[in-house]
Amino acid sequence: DCIEDLRVYLTKSSQNILDSCAGAKVRCADLLYTYIDVEPVAFDRNHYCIDLTFYYRILADATVGVNRPVALQGLAMFSKRAVLCGEDSRAHIYTSRTRLDGSDGLSRVSATHPTAVVEVLDPMVLSSKIRQGHCHEQVAQIPPCICGLFDEELVTSDGNRQLLVTL
């Protein structure tokens, strides 16, 4: 998938730099985590809805005056939904995928839902740009365990300049 104009939720110090910089360019994007949720489709017993959310650490360089570029870091997220055909399983399945205090704060395992597996490569950065904040944009929910992967609090308010990335 080509994912266009993902908002990057910068750390506080990175946001302060972005607000006063002349420009910024994304250097790289690293996949931090992929959240997978499998739920049955109500109208068909053999179909399942797979919800995926990808969490990326974004590293960028900001141009401030004539000095060397200043490093920025933040989080970008992308969600995708797919409906797949699968069969109910009668076997009891025990896997290491059970997570206590997972990214959604819950630990859920169902013996009757199929197991979804996602293979993902780190993305290639195609472009980036800066825009003024949109006051009506819905701010995504960021799980606390993802926020904990950053040294500072992530800025989710809409009033600032925003860094966008295309992966």
Predicted regions and their residues:
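Viral structural modules
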Residues: 1-167
